[in-house]
Amino acid sequence: MQLNSTEISELIKQRIAQFNVVSEAHNEGTIVSVSDGVIRIHGLADCMQGEMISLPGNRYAIALNLERDSVGAVVMGPYADLAEGMKVKCTGRILEVPVGRGLLGRVVNTLGAPIDGKGPVEHDGFSAVEAIAPGVIERQSVDQPVQTGYKAVDSMIPIGRGQRELIIGDRQTGKTALAIDAIINQRDSGIKCVYVAIGQKASTISNVVRKLEEHGALQNTIVVVATASESAALQYLAPYAGCAMGEYFRDRGEDALIIYDDLSKQAVAYRQISLLLRRPPGREAFPGDVFYLHSRLLERAARVNVEYVEAFTKGEVKGKTGSLTALPIIETQAGDVSAFVPTNVISITDGQIFLETNLFNSGIRPAVNPGISVSRVGGAAQTKIMKKLSGGIRTALAQYRELAAFSQFASDLDDATRKQLDHGQKVTELLKQKQYAPMSVAQQSLVLFAAERGYLADVELAKIGSFEAALLAYVDRDHAPLMQEINQSGGYNDEIEGKLKGILDSFKATQSW
C-alpha cells in the first residue's frame, strides 16, 4: 500500500492536533555542600521555612535557613551517600505525620512509620508537626485531675488535665519511672497517652515498651521513638510529632497525656543543628531561640473549651472539652536547676516535680523534694477528699525538715518536738512507693487519713510499710463498696469520714502493731 503526499500531511496534522503538551514546573536546586547531616542548596528560589525538600533516594530534608543565595537544610535520615552536585526539589509541603486511633498500641519513629514489626499503621489522616497553640479565648481553666498513682505527687503536687508539669532531676533519680507509672495508672481512666523517647538507647526504650505491655497500658499508648543513633533532625522533631498525635485526641473532645523524655536531649540536638547551620551561639552555645523551641511545644498542651471542640469537629462532638496534659522531663547536672535549659522550661511550665539524688540514694522513692516541688494550677483539679487530707501532709513534712535540721545541733528535745519529728519520719516513710504499683484515689485517701488522724503514732517506723500493705488488703477484702464509691465520686463528707474512721478503728483492734 502506497501513501500519497496528501494523506501523509493529513496524518501528520492529526498527530499534531492530538499531541498534548503538559509542562510540569518544579523548583529545582543543586546541593553545594554536605556536612554532618546538614546540606546547603543553591537555586531554590521559592522555598518556605520548614518546607520538605525532596532528595534522591526517596528521602527528605527540612529547610531551616533561608539565605540570600542558598538554603540550609537538615536531612531526615542517612546522608552518607549525598554528594555535591546532586539535584533536589521543593515539595511545597511542610512536614506532616499520621494521626488517629490506629496508632494506639504502636511504636513509631518521628515520621510516624512503624518500627515494632506489627505491619503498617492505620491512621485517620495527616497532621502538621508544627501547629499554633490554642488562644486564650479557646481555653478552659484546669479543674479535672490526672492521677499519677503516686501518694507523694497526687497529694502534694497534684496535676490537672491540660497542665504542663515538669519532672526535673539528675540522671538515675527515677524521672522515667515516675512518667511510666503515670501512663500505667491511666489504663482505666480513658486518658490516651503518648510517650516520646528522645536520644535514648534502643534497649532502654524496648524495656519501657515491654513494661507498658506487661501492665496492659500499651494498648492505650503511642510510643514515638528517636534513638540516640538517629540523626539530630529526627531527635529535634520527635516531640513535635508526638504532640501532633496527642492533639488529635484533644481537638476531638478527649483527654490525652504526653511525656517528653527528655527535652534536654532535644535541646542538645537543636544546638547541634544550629551550630552546623552556622547560627550564632549564645549561652552554653545554645542558639538564641532555644526558649521558643520549648515554649511553642509546651503551649500546645492545654484544656480547650466546648466551643473549640464543636468548631473543630464541625458539630459532630458536642458538650465536651478536650485536654492535652504534658509531663516534660529535664535532666540536670549535679542538681543545677539554674542552668539555661532547666530555667527556661521551669518558667514555661505550670510547676515542677523535683527529684533529688540524696533522697533517692537514702531509699526515699519516689525521691520527690516537697520543699521546691510545686503545682501552680493542679490544686483546683484535686478531688475533694485528696484536697482535704493532703494539707496536713505538706505541713507535717515542712515542719519535720525544719526540726530535723535543728535537732542535729540540739541534744535534748521536748516532747512536742520529738512527736513532730516522729510524725514527720513516719509520713516520709508512708509516702515511699514501689515502682509499677500505682494506687487508686481511695487507697491513697485511706492511707493519708491514717497519717492525718494519728493512727501511725503507735506503729514502729520499720513497720509502716507492712502496716500499709495489711490495711489495704483488709479494706479490699471487707470494704470494697466504700473504696469503689470514693474512687467514683472523690467526695468527702462527715459520713465518709466516719466510715474511714470505723475501718481504721476495726483494723487496729484486730491487729497489733
Curated annotation (Swiss-Prot):
- Top-rank lineage group of the source organism: Bacteria
Top enzyme class, one word, equals translocase
Name the residues annotated as site: Required for activity: 373
- Membrane topology, record value: Peripheral membrane protein
What do the Gene Ontology cellular component annotations say? plasma membrane; proton-transporting ATP synthase complex
Give the residue range of the signal peptide: none
Q: State where ATP binds.
A: 169-176
Keyword annotations of the record: ATP synthesis, ATP-binding, Cell inner membrane, Cell membrane, CF(1), Hydrogen ion transport, Ion transport, Membrane, Nucleotide-binding, Translocase, Transport
Catalyses which reaction?
Answer: ATP + H2O + 4 H(+)(in) = ADP + phosphate + 5 H(+)(out)
InterPro entries according to UniProt: ATP_synth_asu-like_sf, ATP_synth_asu_C, ATP_synth_asu_C_sf, ATP_synth_F1_a_nt-bd_dom, ATP_synth_F1_asu, ATPase_a/bsu_AS, ATPase_F1/V1/A1_a/bsu_N, ATPase_F1/V1/A1_a/bsu_N_sf
- Pfam families noted in UniProt: ATP-synt_ab (PF00006), ATP-synt_ab_C (PF00306), ATP-synt_ab_N (PF02874)
One GO MF term on file is:
ATP binding
Subcellular localization, as worded in the UniProt entry:
Cell inner membrane
EC numbers for this chain: 7.1.2.2
Described by its record, this protein's role is as follows:
Produces ATP from ADP in the presence of a proton gradient across the membrane. The alpha chain is a regulatory subunit.
The family line of this record is: Belongs to the ATPase alpha/beta chains family.
Q: How does it assemble?
A: F-type ATPases have 2 components, CF(1) - the catalytic core - and CF(0) - the membrane proton channel. CF(1) has five subunits: alpha(3), beta(3), gamma(1), delta(1), epsilon(1). CF(0) has three main subunits: a(1), b(2) and c(9-12). The alpha and beta chains form an alternating ring which encloses part of the gamma chain. CF(1) is attached to CF(0) by a central stalk formed by the gamma and epsilon chains, while a peripheral stalk is formed by the delta and b chains.
HAMAP family reported for this sequence: ATP_synth_alpha_bact
Q: What NCBIfam families does this protein map onto? A: atpA (TIGR00962), PRK13343.1 (NF009884)
Can you say what this protein is called?
Answer: ATP synthase subunit alpha
